[in-house]
Structures are given as structure tokens and as C-alpha cells.
Amino acid sequence: MEFPIGSVGTTNFRRFTPESLAEIEKQIAAHGAAKKARAKHGERKGQDEKPRPQLDLKACNQLPRFYGELPAELVGEPLEDLDPFYSTHRTFMVLNKGRTISRFSATWALWLFSPFNLIRRTAIKVSVHAWFSIFITITILFNCVCMTQNDLPEKIEYAFTVIYTFEALIKILARGFCLNEFTYLRDPWNWLDFSVITLAYVGAAIDLRGISGLRTFRVLRALKTVSVIPGLKVIVGALIHSVRKLADVTILTVFCLSVFALVGLQLFKGNLKNKCIKRSTDPHNAYNFSSQMADNFYIKNGTTEPLLCGNGSDAGHCPSGYICLKTSDNPDFNYTSFDSFAWAFLSLFRLMTQDSWERLYQQTLRASGKMYMVFFVLVIFLGSFYLVNLILAVVTMAYEEQNQATIAEIEAKEKKFQEALEVLQKEQEVLAALGIDTTSLHSHNGSPLAPKNANERKHRIKSRVSEGSTDDNRSPQSDPYNQRRMSFLGLSSGRRRASHSSVFHFRAPSQDVSFPDGITDDGVFHGDHESHRSSLLLARGAGQAGPLPRSPLASSPNPGPGHREEGQLTAPTGELTTGAPEDLALEAAGQKKNFLSAEYLNEPFRAQRAMSVVSIMTSVIEELEESKLRCPPCLINLAQKYLIWECCPKWMKFKMVLFELVTDPFAELTITLCIVVNTIFMAMEHYPMTDAFDAMLQAGNIVFTVFFTMEMAFKIIAFDPYYYFQKKWNVFDCVIVTVSLLELSIAKKGSLSVLRTFRLLRVFKLAKSWPTLNTLIKIIGNSVGALGNLTFILAIIVFIFALVGKQLLGEDYGCRKDGTALWNEGQLRWHMCDFFHSFLVIFRILCGEWIENMWVCMQVSEKSICLILFLTVMVLGNLVVLNLFIALLLNSFSADNLTAPEDDGEVNNLQVALARTQAFGQRASQAISSYFSSHCRLRWPKVGSQLGVKPSLTSSKAEHHITADAVNTAVGTSAKPALSGPKEDPRDFITDANVWVSVPIAEGESDLDELEEDIEQNSQSSWREESPKGQQDQLWQIQRCEDHQVPNSPGSGMSSEDLASYLGERWKSEATPQVPAEGVDDTSSSEGSTVDCPDPEEILKKIPELADDLEEPDDCFTEGCTRHCPCCKVSTSKFPWTTGWQVRKTCYRIVEHSWFESFIIFMILLSSGALAFEDNYLEQKPRVKSMLEYTDRVFTFIFVFEMLLKWVAYGFKKYFTNAWCWLDFLIVNISLTSLIAKILDYSDVASLKALRTLRALRPLRALSRFEGMRVVVDALVGAIPSIMNVLLVCLIFWLIFSIMGVNLFAGKFSRCIDTSNNPFSVVNSTIVNNKSECRNQNHTGHFFWVNVKVNFDNVAMGYLALLQVATFKGWMDIMYAAVDSREINSQPQWEDNLYMYLYFVVFIIFGGFFTLNLFVGVIIDNFNQQKKKLGGQDIFMTEEQKKYYNAMKKLGSKKPQKPIPRPLNKYQGFVFDIVTRQAFDIIIMVLICLNMITMMVETDGQSEEKTKILGRINQFFVAVFTGECVMKMFALRQYYFTNGWNVFDFIVVILSIGSLVFSAILKSLESYFSPTLFRVIRLARIGRILRLIRAAKGIRTLLFALMMSLPALFNIGLLLFLVMFIYSIFGMASFANVVEEAGIDDMFNFQTFGNSMLCLFQITTSAGWDGLLSPILNTGPPYCDPNLSNNNTSKGNCGSPTVGIVFFTTYIIISFLIVVNMYIAVILENFNVATEESTEPLSEDDFDMFYETWEKFDPEATQFIAFSALSDFADTLSGPLRIPKPNQNILIQMDLPLVPGDKIHCLDILFAFTKNVLGESGELDSLKTNMEEKFMATNLSKASYEPIATTLRWKQEDISATVIQKAYRSYVLQRSLTLSNPLRVPRAEDDDAPLPGEGYVTFMANDSGRLPDKSETTSATSFPPSYDSVTRGLSDRVNISTSNSMHNEDEVTSKEGDSPGPQ
């Protein structure tokens, strides 16, 4: 950490002069020379040493305060760069008034202007000026507004071009053009500007029609707003980041869609051309004539489209008189087809995005057959749900990563800031110790740092500061100002909160004293988009070898001893410090920060230094304080003077009375009730209304408005306006009341009637007392805050695309002057003639509906442009940006928030009021009961004692009793109540001594379940308060009870036998607890009672294992029965009852037997299956009908028998306390009742018919019996509270829109229709203007005045309409009706009310988008909660441990395998060498791709020749792949089938050959076989493509996620199937006879079980449910006939609207919102897991690769390799485990154990290499031990070898031996030389003389290379724990120091020479 505090003062800012430039040149030269020198010596500069730019000095950031105040004369002037990084770059910086940093190149601009040229300096000054940016931004915005207009003069366009040209010229003059850094074109945003300007000039120069396309690029100017507003750049960064991340998903999506498209092409090509054509009466006339004539087509009822058909048995059939023939055109303007790969791909993309896919589904099934539903199920579930949600998962992840990075930056910066302040603080202490009075400097304005407005600040806080600093006796904490300052300086004891849940979350500055960003001049915080400073304050100077911080010393008149003239800093020792700033900082830190210390400074400088320090601190802290103030101090003083009303004492008294009144809890309760009643009043509005009802509602409105106005007035007087308006809720109230008063003064029918809708916002006041609503509003608020920038980006995207559409395609839509569009003689609603309509089209695409608009566009304009535009909007806008929205939403959402809202410490008055009311009610009821008991002398207790009943906790009224005193104390002392606080555990009151419970006298025994239920009831209704310590003893017996239950808690791991004995002991020892008598309240009749625990036997019966052993049924009746009716209590020891007891035991054994259960499951399945046959055609099949009636009776008897058996076996008590048994009981009763009714011939009664339909619930009984479904149901049940919460909140949100809809549209959706047309048409408003005219003109009987079926006539219908809008199904009709509406009973007119579109846009954003995505949030969160509850082991591991754990887990499951041995036969060997080469695999992959391409070329109706060629090519590929298969089998022999992929290839080859053979056979027998079979066989070819997956790693990860999801998805699928099954049975019973219209026709209907399932599968994704509901909403003419006779007894083809609405809305909520979202939750969860696996440092693949490489080095799979081969092995590995050569030293340092023969075990190597990748961690020794044990168990080879040494030991021994050898040789050599020297004089001491050969020895030792440092290897010695003994002694004896210096190696050598290691 560099502490740049040394750099305060104005001296930081020095003008950039030619000398500065010369200095930079010198630095660059020195830097280059140093670099060359390093290169010459072969040194590599470490990565850590690379200097990086300081984050806080980035261009566009604001300069932090610490650098001092910028003198006015230097604003906009070139300055020397403060960032040391740029000391070797030819740059300078410029600061504007707002201290924003701009960097410029110091080279010559355009080779003409030097940095000191006057023209260039002026351009620089202009370009950095704030007003310049503001002017350009305003110009851009104005230009955008102009572009939305249709007919703009060309001159305006030229004006804008001139302004942009001027801007570009200024920037180019200031920056230079493109060659150097920081020049104009080096900024990518300027590319955009430049291209826009260039294109403008090109367009002006060449005025041609084709060039108008160029003009479209003007639109890109809107993007310039992004470059001007800095916050947006970050979001764009996140978007680009997520788009990059989408690469893998995009590849997978394209691959999957291609495969599905190929399947579609093979199955359905040409089918959609089949249409029903009139049979020709002329036998000679060829059919091809009639097939082309549109007049001959059969038109589908209610539409203008020809009816499709197919020739298959289950395809759609033609009516009589028509024949099914293939025509030339496909449906939807010939765009919907599978005729070629491109169209099939488009259809599949449409299916994936689920845009009107139900239409494609119906067309395809009608043309091909119902069996192809399977194709759609696969595509929707695997393609659509999986792929689209993968995109969501990836975008969410990318966003999270971006978020984490930003948060990390903020935190690092805060830490540095904190450290810097600590340094400042220390420095201040030093100065104080030196006797400089820092306090006197507080008022000093002479400091160069003193801010301009320091005087104002000084006056404001002078008194506080001086008090705090001069009075030594006062503690600093006693003053809030000081306290804040202390905590700010990091001196307080409390820790700061670091809660960054999201970067984009708005956090009020008051929440924590941290500096997320630079603070500007005016004390405003800058948003999180600014980059975060790595070093806050480091200055720079010109040193010799690198940038040096310049100290204020440089400018001081008489510097201290640490100063040199040239601006270099010297340490006190006098040495010149040079080098990088990091080195300097370290060095300075090492010397106790001498360069910061004030100790060696002389007096004048100390004073200046002190002023700087104090000035920095005060300036920063005061600025923080100011930023917290909402308005300027002068306004605050004014407000305090005039807005706090304190007059005479009487007024004050009046105020106190009002204060008591408005703060009373009952006032809050009253207001809440009024809000609820007011809301109900508003919701009661409907059409048509009687005048009396209307008058009542009006009167109610006036009363409520007056009431709320009074409330506001009272509160303002009681609190004073000053305090009243500081609360947001009060401001909210005030606005609503004002609008309500305004609305009362306006006539009801006025244009401002929409003001009434503002009253609806009162509903939000409920949030004050409804925590869930409050939380949700907060979530949406947070998201909207967080989404500010993103919303802006989305708005820009919509704006740009809308303009592009208008410019490119507008003219093609046949636009007229009034902005409407004509096409094919009809008006278009969706066109791009004007900006508003263009915006609507783009918005509709963002809602996911793109295909229909695109068809129209392709009809009127160029197909390619339409395709590109629409798909770009769809992919960019919908899939990326909207998913980023959802990611943000999920990020700010958590079910914790919903289930446990944070307690803000305030007493909830509503709860207090409710508690008071409750207490009053309980006291009243108690008084009454005590009165009756004293008079009537009831004797229940006596009965209880006769029966031997033990007292216990049971549910009774008295249980909810709270002492009145307790309530009063709570309210009086404002104790914190926790009434029904969801975050408390229901059992808390047992363990919490502060909770007061009054316990009633027990009535009989209760089992554990009852006890828990009672506890839950108690917790929800009991009043909690802090009670005095004395009262705590009263709960000790309850706590003891809790102690009894502990062992029975789930997961306690106690065996049932232990439990039995434990409970028995406890029971005996604590049978009669004593109760302390003190503190018992008179008012309670029951507090002194004992509370016993249940009998242990009772508990034991609840334990399943023991229940089996006991095999004895429970008591038959409940305690209540036996108490009230003693005859029910029987003695089993007496005669008649003994037999009964034996019977019960027998029944119990039967019921508990597994066979019995299996039989019942079988019966349930059979009976459910039987229901499926009761369809609409049953009356025509008398045999089937009679058989079904018979089987129905049989099933009913069986189920009744089962129920009776269970009653006898379990007893009533156990049977009726089980929820699943209740379900069985109800379903059996339904069957029984309907059977009895049938026998008594009452079956035609309507109510009994409805009862019969309830038999559809029978399959529900299967739920409890299938484990998979039960798991899902349990998970769902767990999520129900949260789901209900969200549902309720959605309803509240929607209520507002629904009431608004009723206000706007009630009665306005009616219209006059002409039924003579098909489909019915709306009569033009010029012919019929209103209802009466429609009735008068109905001469033909064809005119009907009808209402749109889904409308806003009342709030309930409004809800239905909103559900259709939110699911985007049927919303068009509702919108059209709204937009065309005029007045009540007036005929609608085309787009008369155009801007009503905006009502729907707003609802879709808030009501649809937010609320429906909250479902995803809730469910995902609940899954995660439950996962944590179930598998908590992960939570207690650190991230690092998890990495290790996962890596070890993976490598533990692997072991070396023998490679496939090379065959001995030379031919086989040759082939083996070919097929095992990588090149062979690559060739095969290329061939597969080519095969795929040839399959894509196929089209419908291709020529014979093309068919032949493609057939031959196919045969060639089959031959190639067969050849590959044969070669591999020949070479690999039996080993071929050991690989899964080989087996897959083999199957594909067999199928391919089979399909060729079958094709040949079928060709000759074409007339006998259906072509479908032929097509399905050809699909085998597609299997080959799937082999590509083998090669793509990214795709494998994503598919791995899918594979992991499959089990869970299967369970969810089962549940979904069950729901569909039940609903289809209901549908058959209720809607079989509705008229065929809209979505219901002869194929998609509820007449048979199969057809019902087709319909329900379609609406599982909510697709087309409006079409299915539409006919069911018909109640009479002209739509249906209620008197029509049908097949069966029921009459008419009208529907039942109520049943239909309930049926469809419940199904949509269950399937589309809940079950499908569970599916999504599972996918997201598993995707995260899979991605974690793939992003971990070591993946499964790395370990596989390790073992694959191992096989080459250890062909015999001995699991050992020679130490000599280790270096090659390490180098051969790939990926993170590889250790490239030269690696000898690293390997030796790993200290690997050696076994005899110098071999190393694979596990040791893998452990060491893994550690090399993951780094040190001391926590995992035990894990390694476990791993090794596991490995030993599976691979016994290792256990037989005990290590004898390690690689390090071996090296040391080797070196020691070498050293001794060399020394000895040297000695021998010298000796022989000496002895042979004839001049030598022999001496007696020769033998003991020291050897003179030390230099030689050292040289030899150095030769053997660098030795490892023992400190690097000590932790490795424990690596394989079993070898500790080998290495421990070694580490004790040997001490090796690592260094490249000879000096160190000398030491080692001498040591080794002295103590040789054991050999």
C-alpha cells in the first residue's frame, strides 16, 4: 500500500512545460536502456513488478480530494501527470472545474500542433469544459426528438451534422487523430461518432434512393448518449461481458436447434401444404387445377385460413365433399414450413422462444398426426425451457461476476482509504507530541488545501470542534460529531458494515461511513460506475530509474535532512532512494515510514504539514457530513424557524392531545381498516351500476377523503410540518390526499377522471402494517433503482430500433397522412409509419411476440432486412437485456425477505391494537366461563381423574390467554412485540424464558403431533413481551418438556432403543415437577398448573422402526370421545373385547403389509385409467359404458373396504389425524355418494353431476404412494407460504390496475357485429354509431350488440383480462378493444383512444414483468433454502476447502488403467496406429460435419437428380462410418466395446445400414407402408451428428448440467403429468360439448382424453389458453345455442364461464407459474453446479488427462514410474497440472517419497501436482489421509511398498556424495602433486593440514544446480502423511537456504560436507 499523504498541497499540480516533456523523454530512454540491460542478462521481470495505472487516476474519473485544491489558474491547463505509471509515457493530464481527469498525448497533433501550441491548448480547454459536454448532450437529445418526427426539413439535419463535425474537429485538434495513445480514434466511442459523421457526408454527397439506408445510421447518434453519460458505459460493459459469456450457450443452442430442425425437416417436409380441396365433379379435370384455386379451399370456421389436413390415421380429416391434397403454398404467407433447413430452423427458433408456438403445434399435428406431440414435448422441455433458461443462467452469472469484481474494488479502496486515514491520524499524534497545536489549525484557511467554502463550514462546526478538542476531560465519544469523526477515522470499536448485495443497489450514505467513490466538490457521491482507486493519494515526481512520489518537502523553504534538490527523496541515512513507487513505499514502511513522519522536519514545515493534515481530514469529513444533508444549511434554518409550530401553552396542550390521538395503536388500526374498506368500495365499481349504488360509492368516497384529510391535518399539527414531511410515508399520504381533494373538485366525467386512480395508491399504505408487501415494494424499488442505468440502456435500444424500423421500413407499410397504414385493402395496427407505432412493434418483440409482425414486414418489405431487424431485437433485447433485468431482480430478491421481514425496531402499532383487542376478548370470555363454571359446577376434571388422564398441553381457548397487565406493560413501556413474527421458530416460546404463556388445565393426553400443533397455534396467537427475570421460572417445566423431546428431533442420530430407555428414565425421574408459586396472577385461572410431557409409550409408537416391532394399533378413539362417552373406553382384557383386539391386530398387519399397499396402488392406477374412457363418445359405446359402470362399483367397494380396514387397524384417531388419509376419505366418499345416487336414479341432478366430476381427483391418491412425486410435493408445500405471499401481493398490485381498468374502460368494450360474415366482423362506426342504432338497423337479423368476452366491466373480469395481458395470450383483442373504445354504448372507432396502449405497456412492465418473475425468485430461493436445510455440510466449509475437497473427491474416484495393448499382429498393429491417432478422430469429425451439411441441403420438392445425388452421398457416408467402425473393431478387438462412445457409434452405424436397407425395401412396397415410418427410419442418420458433442468441452458442461437435472426433472414431469391428467378428466366432464371456435376445433377439444391432453400440454406454457377459454365464455346467441341437442343427455353447446375461468386460471397458476418454474429452478441450480465444476482450477478432465498420460509411462499399470522419467512425465502433461521443462528443481522441491528402485507412486505425484496448482493449505492433511486410505482400499499395490527416501533427501545425498567425491579427488590430486614435487620439504603435520581446494569444491557444488529452500518444502513433508517418518528427521537435521547466490551454496556445501546424509 502506497501512502501518498506525503503529496498534499498545491505543489502537486505543475504545469506541463517543454522541460517536463524533456524529463519524460529522459525517463523513457532510461527505461529502455534498463530493459535492454535486463534482456542482455536474460532476466525476466516478474509479473508482479509490472506497473499498472492507478485506478483512482483513470481518465474520466474525478480527482480525489487528497491531492489538494486545484488552483483556478490551472483549470483546463496541461499539467504533469500525477500517475507514476505515465512517467514513461508521452502524456499529460488536464483537469476541469469539476476535477474530472482527461489525458492527452504529448506528441504533435496532426503533425502540426505541439502540446504548447495556442490553438491546441484552446481546443483542449474547450473539449474538457463541462458546458461543452452539456451542449453536445442536449444536441443529441434534441436530435433524437427530431428524428422521431416524420417530415423534417433537411436543413435541420445539416445543422446537426455541422455541430457534430465541430465537436469532432475540436476533439481531433485537442487529441490528435489516431497514431498515439489518447488520440481521437483510440477511443472506441469516437469510432461511432466518426462513422456517423462520415456517413452523413456520404449521404449528402450522393443523393440516391439506395443511400437512404445510409441515413438510417444517423439513428446511431442516440448511442452517443452512452458515451456522454459515464454510468451507462459500465452497464454496456456488463452487457458485452454477458454476450461474450454466451458463446458456449449460443453454440449449444444453434447445435440443438440444428439437430431438431433436421428432425423436423425429415418428419414434416411438405406436410403443411396439405389442404382440404373441393372434390372435382368433372372426372377429366386434373386436381392440380383445383388445388391452386383459393376458392376451392375449405375455410376453417371463424378464420380466413384454409383447413390443413393429413393422410395419416390420426391426422386431421377433411369434411365430406372435400379431399386432402398437397398444394403449392404453406400457411402464414408461405413462411411457416419445414420444407428446407432454413425454414425448419426458423420454426424451431420460434418454438424455442415460444412465440405463438401453439399455432405451429396445431398446424403440424393436424397435417402429420397426433403422435408427433412427442416431438413438441421434447422441443419445448429440452429446447425451449432448457436453452432459454441457460441463457438466463449465463447472463445472471456474468452479472454476478461483474458485480463481485466491482464490490471487491470498492472494498479494496475503502481499506486503503481507512489505512491512509490511520496514517494521517498517527501523523497528527506525532505533531501533537512535537508541541504543534493542531486544534488552532482547524480554523486556518491559509492551507493550500483549505476548501473554498471552508469559512461556511468553520462557522457551522467551530463551537463543537473547539469544545471537543480543548476540554481534555470530556471523552471524545460523548460528542456525536466527534464520535462520527472517530468512527470515520477507523478508531471506533464498532465494525463497519460491508453489505454489498448488489453493485447497482442504491445505498443511502448514512448507512455506513465508507467511501464507495470519489467525493466531488459539492459533496455529492459519485455512482458506482467510477473505477475504484487502488492508491488514493500517490503523487509522482521525476526520479532517475522510475517514478517517485513527490513530497511537500520539495517545495519547503528549508527542508529537513531527507531532501535533495532534484525532487528525489532521500532516506535519513542520506542514500538516494530510486526505483518503483512500490519499492519506495516498502522501503519507507520498513523505516517506520520516515518519509511520512514529521519527526525530522523543521519547524515551519511542521506547521505547514500539520495544516495540510488537518485540512485533509476536516475537508473529507465535513464533505461526508454535508453529503448526508438533504438540503443546504440556510434552508434548514429557515424550515426550523417557520415549520416548527410552538406557540402558547394551550396550543401545546392541544398538540399533545392530538399527538396522543394519532400515535394511539387504535388510531392506526382504524386507519388501516378505513384503507381496506375504501379499497373494497373502489373495487365494487362495475358496469352497469344503478344510480343508488353509484351515489353510495360517491358518498363513501367523500367520507373517506374527509377522513384521510383529517388524519393528515391532525398529524401535521401533532408532529409539526418540519418533522411530518421527513417521513416518506407522510409525504405519500399528503400527495394522495391532495389529489383526492383535487379530484372531488373536478366533474366526474371530466378528462381528469383518471385522477381517481391515484386514490388506489392508498392500498400501498397497507405496506406499513403488512411486512411482505413492504418487502416486495422495497424489492421492486431496489430493482428499479438498480435498474436505472439498465432501463436507460433498454430505452435507448428500443428507441434506436424503433427509429431504425421507421427509417428503413416505414415507407413500405403504405403509410397515409394520418399515420395509419393500409395493406391488402385493410388497416394495419402494427406498422412502422410513425415513431409511436414503431415503438409499439419493438415493445411487442421485447414481450416475446415477434413472428407475426415479421411475417407482415416480410410481405411489405425486403425479407432479409426484416429477418435481420426482428431477430436482432429478439436476441439482443429479449434474450440478453431482459434476462439481465431478471438477473437483477433475482439478485435483489430472497425468500428470506419474504418470510422474515427485518424487524426495524419499531413497535408495530397495529399488532399492539390487535393484541389489546384480543386480550379484551379473552378476558370477557374468561369472565363468562368462570361465571358459568361457578354456577353450574361442571365436573369434567373429576371424569378426567377417573380415566387416569395425564395433564398436558392441548389446544383450548384459554391457551391464548395473556394477562392484561402484561399487555398494559407492553404498551406502556413500548416493549417490542413479536406477534406472529414469521422469523421466530414456532417452538421458540418453549425455550425462550422471556416469553409469557398462560397454560390451561390439561384435558387428556396429546401425542407429539398435537403438541407441535398447539405450540404453533400458541406462537401465532400468543402475546410476547420482555418479562422481568422473576417471572422466568414459571416456564421451567415447559423447558423440561422440551428437553424430553430433544432426542426425537430429526437427525439427532439416536437409535430408537436408546430413545426408549432414555425417555423411560427421564419419565421416572421427573414425573412430578414442582412449580414455583410466586408471580402467579389472580386473573389467570390456570397458570399454576403442571405441564406434563406425553407418555413415552405414546412417543415410541410414533417412531416407525418401533411401530413395526410393537405391531399394535393405537387407541381407536380420541381422548375427547372417551372423556365424553366413557363407553368408548373399553378394557381389552375382558371377553368380548379381546377378540376385537385380535381382529384389530390382524387388520393392522394386513394394512401394513407391502403387498396390500401394492394392490391398492394398482387399483388406484386402474380406476384412474378407467376415468380416461368416460369421454364424449361413451353414449355411442353401450358395452364400454356398462363395463365402466361395473368397474366403477368394484373400485368403489375396494376403496371403501380399504378405508374400513384402516379404520379398524389404525383407529379413528390415527386415521383422521393424517392428511393423506383425509384425502383418501374425501375421494372415497365422493365415489360412494355418486354410486348411491346412481343406484337411486338421482344421477341427473346437476349437483350430483358436479360431484361425479370430482372423481377426477382419484389419481391424487397416488401422490402419497410414489416417492418421486412426494419429494416434489413436499418441496412445493414448503414453498407454499412464500408462493401465497407473492400471489397475494400480485393480487394487490393487480387490484390497482384492475380498478384503473374499470375506471377507464367499464362499459366501453361493447360493439355492434355483423354475423353474416365469417369470421364475425365489427360494423364500421360510420354505419352504426351506438347501441340504439345497432338495434334499429337489425333488419336482416345479422346485427348483434355484444360485449368483448374478456373486458373491464368489473374488477373480477379485470383480473382475468390482466392475467391474459401478463401471459401475453389474448392480450391483443383486449388492447384493440381498449384503443378503439370511445364512450359507453358507442361503436368503437379505429385507434380513437390511441394512447391507451401505454396503460398496457406500464402494466406489462410492473404487473407482468416484475410480479411474474417474482415467482421464479420465490421458487428458486425456496429450493435453495430447503437444500441448505437438508445438506448443510457445504455451509461449514470455506471456499478453498471446497475446491480441495472437490478436487480430491474427483481424483479419489480415478485410478490408472492399463492402456489398450497394441496388437502383436503387424496388420492389426498398423491399423491400431492409425485409429489411435488424433488426426484420425479429426478427419472423422470433419466427415460428420460434411454429412450434416449434406442433410441440410435437402428440400421439399427437389428434383429427381438432386435426390439421387444426395442418396449416393448418404450411401458414401454410411460406408465411411461403417469402415471406421470395422477398422476400430479390427484394431481394438474386444476392447472396442469398453468405451461408451464406441458403443454409441456402433449403434448409429447399425441403424444407418438398417435405414438404407429398409429404404430400398420400402421403395418397392411404397403403397403398403406409411411414408411416416420411412421418415422415422431416416432419423438414424442424425445420430451421427451427436458424436460432435464428444469434441466440444463447453457443450459437454452444459449437457452435463442437463444430465444432472434429469432425475429431478423426471419427478417434476410426473407431477405435471398428474396435474394434466386430473384437469383433462375435469375438462372432459365439463367442456366436451362447447362450440368449435377460436382454439377449439375437431382435433383440439375436450371430447376425448387424448384431445384434452393435447390441449393441456399446449397451455402448460400458457400458450393459447385464451383460445380454449373463449368458447367456454359463450352464454348464448350469436356465439352458441343453449338448446342444441348433443350426443349425450346434456343440451346446448354453450360453456360455463365461471367453471371455465376457475379451471384455466388455476391450471395456469399451478402449471405455468409453479411447476414450470420449479423446472427452471432445477436447471439454474444444476447449471451453477456444472459451471462451478468446469471453472474449478482442476476438473474431471484434468485428472483423466493425467491418467491418460500416465498410461504411456506405465504401460503395465504398476502405479509407479521411475524418478528419472518424472521430468518428461511432468512436461508431457497438459493443462494446469503441467510443469514445463526445466522442471528438475521444482520436482525435487516437492519432496516426493521414493520406494526401492527409485520409483514414485502415481498418487504421490498427483497430490504434489494438485498442491502445485491449488497452493498451500494446512487444513487438509486429514482429507489427504482419508484419500490415501480410500486409494489403498481400491489399489492394493501401493501398500506393499514402504518409502525409503524422498526426492529432496535423494538430491541432498547425491550432492553430498558429489561434494565428498570432488573433495577427495582434489585432495588426492594435490597430494600426488605435492608428493611428486622434488622441491617439496615434507612436514610432520601434512596429514592434518586443511585442504586448499575450497574454491574448487564450491565451483563443483554450484555446478549441480540450485538447491531448494527447506522453508519451501516443510509443509510438503506432511504431504503423504504415512511418509512423515522418512522426512521428519531430515527436516530436523538439515537446513538448506534457497538462493541463487554462490555464497549460500557455499554454506550448504560446507554443511553437507560436514554431515553426510545416511546412505
From Swiss-Prot:
Post-translational modification: Ubiquitinated by NEDD4L; which promotes its endocytosis. Phosphorylation at Ser-1453 by PKC in a highly conserved cytoplasmic loop slows inactivation of the sodium channel and reduces peak sodium currents.
Stated family: Belongs to the sodium channel (TC 1.A.1.10) family. Nav1.8/SCN10A subfamily.
Location(s) in or outside the cell: Cell membrane
Source species of the chain: Onychomys torridus
Superkingdom per UniProt: Eukaryota
Gene name per UniProt: Scn10a
Name of the featured protein: Sodium channel protein type 10 subunit alpha
IQ domain mapped to chain residues: 1853-1882
Biased composition (Basic residues): 33-43
